[in-house]
Amino acid sequence: MLLSPKFSLSTIHVRLTAKGLLRNLRLPSGFRKSTVIFHTVEKGRQKSPRSLCIQTQTSPDVLSSEKALELAQYKSKCTKQSGIILQLKQLLSLGNTKFEALTVVAQHLLSEREEALKQNKTLSQELVNLRGELVTVSTTCEKLEKARNELQIAYEGFVQKLNQQHQTDLTELENRLKEFYTGECEKLQNIYIEEAEKYKTQLQEQFDNLNATHETSKLKIEASHSEKIELLKKAYENSLSEIKKSHEMEKKSLEDLLYEKQESLEKQISDLKSENDTLNEKLKSEEQKRISREKANLKNPQIMYLEQELESLKAVLEIKNEKLHQQDVKLMKMEKLVDSNTALVDRLKRFQQENEELKARMDKHMAISRQLSTEQAVLQESLEKESKVNKRLSMENEELLWKLHNGNLCSPKRSPTSPAAPFQSPRNSGSFPSPSISHPDDLPGNQRQTEGISAGLTLPATAHHPP
C-alpha cells in the first residue's frame, strides 16, 4: 500500500504543482532526503529481481538471512514514509487554510478597491464642479474689485469736496466767533476784575482775622505752658528740699546712735581692762603661792605631779577663756553689723520709695510737657497750613488778575454773577445756524480757562476757617 503510485511522492508533487500551491508549502529539512531515499528504494526494487535471479543460485540460508534483513529495512522505510506522508497532509491542510485566507483578503481588497474607485469618481466630479465655481467666483471677485475701485474714487472726491466745504464753514465760524468773543471778553474782564477785587478784600480780612486769632492763641498757650513749667519747677524744688531735710534728719539720728554705741563700747572696754588687772593680780598671788608650795613640797613627788597637772589645766582653761572672749567680741561685732545692716536696709527701702515717687512725679510732669509740646506743634502745623492756603489763594488771585489784565480770558461760559442774556442772544439770532459746531483749537482752551477761573473764584467761599 505504501509503495503504490497513488501515494508516491511524484504524484503528490504533480498535484501540488497543478494547484499552484508549491510556493506556499514549506517542507521540513528532511523532505528532500526522504525523496532521494524513495527514489533509491524504487530503483532497488527494480533491480532486486535481477539480483534475486542471480542469487537463487546461492545457498538457501543466505537468501533467508538477506530477506529478513531486507524486510526489516523495508519496514523501517515504510514507517518513515508514513510519517512523511502525515507531515505532508498537515502541510496541505495548512496550505489550504492559507489559500482560503488569501482569497478572503483578496476579496476584501477588491471590494475596497471598488469603493475607492467609486469615491474617486465622486471626488473627480466634485473637483470639476468646484473648478467651475472657482471660475465663477473669480469673475465675480474681479467685478467687485472694479466696482470697489470706482466707489473709492467717487468717495475720495466726495470727501475732498466735504473737507473744502468744512474748512470754509470753519473759517466763517472762526471769524464770527472771534467777533462775538471779543465783545464778551471785554465784558467778562470788567466783571472778573470787580469780583477779584472783592474777593481780594475778603481774603485779606480773613487773613488778618486768622493772624490775630493765631497770635492770641499762641500767646495764651505760651503763657499757660510757662505757668505749668514754673509750677512743675516749684513742686520739684519743694520735693527736693523735703527729701534733703529728711536725709539730714536721718543722718543726724544715725550719728547720735553711733556716738552712743561708741561710748557704751568704751565703757565695756574699761570694765574689761579693770577685770583683766584684777585677774592678773590674782594670778601673780597664786604663782607666789605655788612657788612657796613647791619649795615646801620638794620632797613629795606625788604632790609635784599633781601641781604640774593643775598648772597644765590652768593653762588650758586660760586658752579656752581667751577663745571664748574672742568669740564674744566677734558676736558683739556681728550684732552691731546686723543692727547697722537692718537700719541701712530700712533707709534704703525708704529712699527707694521716695525715689519711685519722685520718678512718678517726673514722668507725670514729662507727659504733661510732651502733651503741651504736641499741642503746640499741632497748632503750629494748623497755622502753617492756613498760611499756605492763604498764600495759595493770594497767588491764584494774582494770577487771575494778571490774566485779566493781559486779556487771556476769552470764553463763552458765563460767570456766576454774569447775566444769561448775552449768551442766548447770538444763538437765537440768525448769524449762528449751528450752535453745537465749534473750532477744536479755540473753544476747548477758552472753556478750560473759564472753568479754572470760576473754580479759583469759588475757592474763597469754601475756604477753611480756623476752629
Swiss-Prot record:
Its main location: mitochondrion. The gene is MTUS1. Belongs to the MTUS1 family. Keywords: Cell cycle, Cell membrane, Coiled coil, Golgi apparatus, Membrane, Mitochondrion, Nucleus, Phosphoprotein. This is Microtubule-associated tumor suppressor 1 homolog. Residues 106-401 form a coiled coil. It is found in: Mitochondrion; Golgi apparatus; Cell membrane; Nucleus. Residues 425-437 have a biased composition (Polar residues). It comes from Bos taurus (Bovine). Cooperates with AGTR2 to inhibit ERK2 activation and cell proliferation. May be required for AGTR2 cell surface expression. Together with PTPN6, induces UBE2V2 expression upon angiotensin-II stimulation. GO terms for molecular function: microtubule binding. It comes from the Eukaryota. The modification Phosphoserine is found at S373, S394, S415, S425, S429, S431, S434, S438. InterPro entries: MTUS1/CCDC69 (IPR051293). One of its GO terms (biological process) is regulation of macrophage chemotaxis. GO terms for cellular component: Golgi apparatus; mitochondrion; nucleus; plasma membrane. Homodimer. Interacts with AGTR2. Interacts with PTPN6. Residues 411-467 are annotated as: Disordered.
